[in-house]
Structure formats: structure tokens, C-alpha cells
């Protein structure tokens, strides 16, 4: 059993997932959009949230032409239930429900700044102390296919005690191939750091591809790699930080 589970760790988005940041075409003052996806596994920042099991996810977003946006994300999870079982008690906490909002604006040609807030909510997680619910503020900048993002928690981070002020930084590139514009190469490198809990820090990298099937459908896969210390991320023999191939299909509407 992982020792960090005593502190209720949850860590670990690539391409499509819970990270805030709306991507949709502005065709009017107000734009509503959504995305439904099926993943072979829900991993977040390199760490499995579903104990290597599939996940069904939904994003709903609103954006105004001023740059303001707000949205929500829902996914099934297993890490809280597995943590409870590993520690001898029962939990029905099998849902993650996030709410995010912010403001995007252009500062130069092809350069966009994104500033916002993200709240991670875990309904039915009342048995866990400290609470896994987490608040983060973030700032990002994108130029063409490249994007840099920094996030910092304003609360304890995913239940880790005394971890307010933890940080996450990532650099991602999503590059459509000129010869095959429907095929996008995705690459990411990031680092998660836990305030006052440095033994949990790790780096994650991901490389993969997404193919646009048309009519809002996309399929893709990527390989994720972390250097997280296995002893802190293993529950009942399952290493949540294990290097794995993840596949997905999504529908945007």
C-alpha cells in the first residue's frame, strides 16, 4: 500500500482532459460548446485516476467574444474508492466534477494569454481527511502550436497535508502535419511540485497523435512517462505512476 495514500494524494492532462482552457471558434458574442470522450484510462498529470480502467468524460463550455470563459468537466474516477479500500473503510466517491473560468486575450499576432481559476470537486468524499477538493489559479501563454502553462494551488493539493502553494508547469506542442493536416502530433513535458512534500515531486512527458475523423470526431493515443517515486504512488500493488499507452475517442459539439 502506498504511504502517501495516508495523505490522500491525487495528482497528475494532455490533449483533452480536465485542464481549463476553452478551444472553440467564436461565431457570435456567445459560444456554447462541449466534448464527450472515452479514454482507455483517465490519467491526470501523469498519474492514473481510474486505476488503469476506462473513463467516460464530459466538458461543457461557454465563451464570450470578450475573452471570458467558464466551463465544467466530469469524469469517473477510482482513486478515492481504492484508497478507502486500502485503508480499511468504504467510500462511494467515484466522480470528479471540476469548474473553471478565466479570461483569454491576444497580446500580439498568434500570441494568446490565458488567466483563470480551476476548482476540483470530489462529491461523496466526506470520509477523507484532509479533503481532496482543490483550488488552483493558472496563467498560460500560447504561440502558434506551442503553449506554456503555470498553475499554483490556493488550498491543500488533492488532500496532501500542508501543500497549499504547490505548483505545476507544463510546455506542450500540438503540431498539425502539413502533409496530413488531419493528423496532429502532440508532445508535452511538465513538472508537478508539492509544497512542503518534495518527496512527491515528479516530471512527466507525453508523446502521441490525434486524428480528425470529421463531424466532430477525433481518435488518438499517446504514451506517458513519469519519474515519480513508485513507493508513494502504489495502492494495493497498482502503480498509478506507471508508464503507459493511453487511447481515446472524442466527439465535439
Question: Can you say where each PLM-predicted feature lies in the sequence?
Answer:
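Cleavable N-terminal export/targeting peptides
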Residues: 1-31
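Outer-membrane beta-barrel "beta-signal"
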Residues: 144, 211-213, 238-253
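Repeated loop/turn-to-beta-strand initiation elements of outer-membrane beta-barrel proteins
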Residues: 32, 66-72, 109-115, 145-150, ...
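Detector for outer-membrane/organellar transmembrane beta-barrel domains
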Residues: 132-196, 224, 251-252
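Short glycine/proline- and aromatic-enriched beta-strand/turn motifs that initiate or cap beta-hairpins
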Residues: 26-80, 84, 244
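Residues that define the transmembrane beta-barrel architecture of outer-membrane proteins
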Residues: 30, 52-56, 93-97, 131-137, ...
Amino acid at each position: 500500500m502506498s504511504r502517501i495514500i495516508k495523505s490522500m494524494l491525487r495528482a497528475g492532462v494532455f490533449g483533452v482532459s480536465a485542464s481549463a482552457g476553452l478551444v472553440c471558434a467564436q461565431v457570435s458574442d456567445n459560444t456554447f460548446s462541449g466534448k464527450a470522450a472515452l479514454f482507455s484510462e483517465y490519467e491526470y498529470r501523469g498519474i492514473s485516476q481510474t486505476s488503469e480502467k476506462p473513463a467516460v468524460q464530459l466538458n461543457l463550455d461557454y465563451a464570450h467574444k470578450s475573452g471570458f470563459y467558464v466551463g465544467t468537466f466530469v469524469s469517473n474516477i477510482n482513486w478515492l474508492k481504492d484508497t478507502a479500500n486500502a485503508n480499511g473503510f468504504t467510500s462511494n466517491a467515484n466522480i470528479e466534477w471540476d469548474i473553471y473560468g478565466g479570461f483569454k486575450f491576444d497580446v500580439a499576432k498568434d500570441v494568446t494569454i490565458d488567466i483563470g481559476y480551476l476548482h476540483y470537486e470530489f462529491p461523496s468524499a466526506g470520509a477523507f481527511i484532509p479533503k481532496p477538493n482543490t483550488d488552483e489559479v493558472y496563467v498560460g501563454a500560447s504561440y502558434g502550436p506551442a503553449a506554456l502553462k503555470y498553475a499554483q494551488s490556493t488550498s491543500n493539493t488533492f488532500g496532501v497535508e500542508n501543500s497549499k502553494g504547490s505548483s505545476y508547469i507544463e510546455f506542450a506542442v500540438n503540431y498539425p502535419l502539413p502533409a496530413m493536416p488531419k493528423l496532429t502530433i502532440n508532445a508535452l513535458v511538465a513538472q508537478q511540485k508539492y509544497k512542503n512534500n518534495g518527496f512527491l515531486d515528479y516530471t512527466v512527458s507525453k508523446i502521441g497523435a490525434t486524428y480528425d475523423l470529421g463531424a466532430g470526431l477525433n481518435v488518438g493515443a499517446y504514451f506517458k512517462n513519469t519519474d515519480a517515486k513508485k513507493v508513494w504512488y502504489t495502492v494495493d500493488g497498482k502503480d498509478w505512476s506507471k508508464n503507459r499507452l493511453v487511447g481515446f475517442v472524442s466527439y465535439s459539439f
